[in-house]
Amino acid sequence: MGDLALLSCKKKLALQCSRHLYQQEIDHLQLTFLAEGKQGTTIISPCISRGEQQIATACIEAHIPFIVLLVGGFPPYYKPTPLYLQACAEGRLLLLSPFQWQNEKITNMRQRCLYLNELAKRICEEANKKG
């Protein structure tokens, strides 16, 4: 859901931060990603940890192109948050998931998170090779 052209952007940067970071470390990373985004870099992340979610929100609010990899897939009749919906409508956001929606509790959450972080890195590496 969103603008598939974001996958073709030449410069991408994966956002991954530990859930154990202090707030000041997250704030520092946020400044780094905002600066990269303002230089034309598309940010990509599964937005799993609190820090990743905070940085993603700040980037999207700053009109920085962003790709979100959803850990749980798309539920039926999925409607993104107003922030995501507006960014999608403006061509600044792409929501992707390699997983089908499942209503049950996800039992392999750690493996999914690791996979999505690796996928984000690979997408960035491929784009940066071409650029």
Task: Map each language-model feature to its residues.
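Glycine-biased, small-residue-rich flexible motifs in mid-sequence functional cores and linkers
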Residues: 1-131
